[in-house]
């Protein structure tokens, strides 16, 4: 069997170039890569289909076909051109997706993969077009949905035109509605994601969130080849570097390792630490920043968006007198990240994820697999992951509650660390994720792929206008 992953945004290459450095190179790419590799290890032939880019600023993505060394025989990265040669952010891909699908069909000479799995709204729409053109079946994994984003941006009749021009919500919502309607199954990471996000009024009539036949809840996994208790190939070097650079080595660290995005609410966790004499006495703060060793000196090197998130964090650290209590860690790869987690785990440290909302929460599972105790937002996926008591759940909007949760985790660090390690082994591995995907795909292959939609045009402006009008009443 050959399975095609539809993921036009971002890109893939053997060295994971640009990951976490751009909004289109985040956790979704990790997810697609790891599920694809795990399926290949199960003996399935896998193609990760993305966009070909021939741009001097993005030289890694110019080859039409490449591979991951660990699974060269069964997994290909296939780059299909569309929309010209230059890199395009995901918001600019919408007019070119039909061209991309035409390129996919041309690449396979109409001998398409046996089944597709689509990712995000743009990949989902590609699945819809492929189904219309070839009767191919597909699953849809949304990762995040446009309705929640426009709500968070407080979209209303007054600002709808400008926000739609920037984020193309009318196209994205239409693509999501079509993907939900046409997919053989919708895959979510948690039950909460299914029941809350897919029940949004903008998806009414496209899918019923309570319909068990339309959904499969499949948790993501941890790359246990990298994130685990056993030392990796760079641990010795990372340990030497941290030992040389960091003060007060035996004190626990409160580890914050999230991309510089306002949604991650790093400021809330830093405020919890800075405002708590108890935490400052018991532990130091370790703040992870990619490609930056001293942000007070190097903040100008960061992109404007990241700089705007980091500036108030640095101001708070400085104004509260906590600068001498904070360490900055530059983790340049996943291997370095995991090695540093193991280093801090040996010092009874705690990982904190204080996102205002986290759709799933892979980062705390990775940290827990390396031996850190976990404090995580109660909003979103972590509420299910840690429902068994393997982590401490907190209200991310309340710095005092975050501080209290961190204090609890520090007090019982060994117990929490062991619980989350067991939780990872039993539930959150990519092998289990791939096995569940395969079961859903095999069931989908037995279904008839009849189109449910009369039109697949990307225009949800009527639904959007109606929703915003009701919301403003």
Put a short name on every predicted segment:
Residues 1-473:
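Catalytic cores of nucleotide-sugar-dependent glycosyltransferases that transfer UDP/GDP/TDP-activated
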